[in-house]
Amino acid sequence: MLAIPGISLFDPGQFVITPGAEAALAEAGEDAHPYLRRHLSGDWGDLCVEDQQENAYSLDHNLRLLSAYTLGNGTKTWIITEADRSATTVLLPDEY
């Protein structure tokens, strides 16, 4: 599990990756783990200030968490943790 005591801000639940995100990561020659670690530590990536503030609120109120990252080849990816913390999913924006 990637939840690291003292670093992870929340329980990620089960990790899931969509076929599109898995293919995009493979095409970019990258792995999801660094992005998942960033998400779990509160580094929300390429989110605007308003969405980062929404995540801060969501942490305190057990709401959905969103991160957005750009892979080395320019592909946009999202990571979403469900409000009930049952699952964290790596996906492409068009798979939402």
Regions found by a protein language model. Name each.
Residues 2-66:
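Compact soluble domain cores
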Residues 59-96:
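Short, compact, well-ordered microdomains
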